[in-house]
């Protein structure tokens, strides 16, 4: 095990605070509508230009071990806020820096760090309650567009695209972001359920122009095993042929004789069928087959449920108004499932989302809810260059997270105004002793900081603006984009309550840990040993008999 350097007290804290300041100073220049850009070096290709706080934070790694520990703790604030609320990373970093800076003054003057932390926690809890009180629900398309625009650094086209997407697929629908092929942003909406499996043979295509197989009013056969013997399928095929309707078969795989027979029947026009592999793998495949069954009003033919292919009847098959099968995707439109059953299934999957531990599982479950409840929208981001595309795509993703947060918990006045208003709940607070009161004061001062930074980045005098905004009431604030004092909500400058709340809570949590740190342990830098000398010269013939 490598030797460690142990540093105590002020020496440890001051070094860590230096790291906090280096990271925060690089991140906070991006805050607000007039925030500046930061250029990030890439080991391959050109540099990335960004105004996204968390992207800047993630790039920072400092040489000094203690400074780096401080920087990493604040990086945690940014990434945690980004994970929970999807935005507010720069605000969280600015708040954390301010709480640490003010707190260090009190710690240096001999106050008890634990009591300071208790005061900070008490103030933050009161501020969060106040934010919830002043929050208003975000329901209209206009409000959703405003939240998206602000989060995307005042880009109204992004906000409008997101609002349009949410309008089409509903609040629960899946909205994904992809690279576009043109200069303009585009929105593609897929109604119904789509999964990423296409036809098993191009001979199933019946619409050569679009290269898709279209089935109108088809039956849907769902099976969880491989099908290779046509005898297994014959009873069902005969019943479907009598009904005179097309058939979509979704199974683990369809191969050999079974696939060949289906293709021949299709070409001859005897029976219109399309065979598709089941989506997903393992347990997720079973769950998705069950989803499709509920959506189409059918049953999965599986041994576990006591059903076999040979004995399957039309009653076990699902139905839909229309199904389109492409090379890579299958879309089921207007399944015949009962609305009550679909709702019950959505509830069940939502309960699993609550219990999910990994982000990946949560994302996949969320996709399943969307496919059952609404549809899928794809925002294709257009830009002139690769660098611009990356930067814009990151902003669209941020804005998307922010709008979801706004729909979830509502909105408050943006531009740092909500935090100024929430200070009223803290002003009357008192702690158990003078040190706790100092902790409350630290938070009071920190809650001005986002507004100060927004104004500073806009090139104005921060103290004057903070005093003017604090003297006002309600949504009265300073719109840095226009340099005017306005009603922030009417002007469309709003923040999701969840973003503001999460930023404050995460900042206070990490800053409190830093203030109560009294020792730091870091690995000593390794000294590289000098290279050993070369091999000695040849030994020559030593006259040894072999």
UniProtKB/Swiss-Prot annotation:
Belongs to the chaperonin (HSP60) family. Keywords: ATP-binding, Chaperone, Cytoplasm, Isomerase, Nucleotide-binding. GO terms for cellular component: cytoplasm. Its main location: cytoplasm. Its EC number is 5.6.1.7. It is an enzyme of class 5 (isomerase). It comes from Burkholderia lata (strain ATCC 17760 / DSM 23089 / LMG 22485 / NCIMB 9086 / R18194 / 383). Residues 534-546 have a biased composition (Gly residues). One of its GO terms (molecular function) is isomerase activity. It catalyses: ATP + H2O + a folded polypeptide = ADP + phosphate + an unfolded polypeptide. Forms a cylinder of 14 subunits composed of two heptameric rings stacked back-to-back. Interacts with the co-chaperonin GroES. Together with its co-chaperonin GroES, plays an essential role in assisting protein folding. The GroEL-GroES system forms a nano-cage that allows encapsulation of the non-native substrate proteins and provides a physical environment optimized to promote and accelerate protein folding. It is found in: Cytoplasm. Residues 526-546 are annotated as: Disordered. ATP binds at residues 30-33, 51, 87-91, 415, 479-481, 495. PANTHER family: 60 KDA HEAT SHOCK PROTEIN, MITOCHONDRIAL. This is Chaperonin GroEL 2. PROSITE patterns: CHAPERONINS_CPN60. InterPro entries: Chaperonin_Cpn60_CS, Cpn60/GroEL, Cpn60/GroEL/TCP-1, GroEL-like_apical_dom_sf, GROEL-like_equatorial_sf, TCP-1-like_intermed_sf. GO terms for biological process: protein refolding.
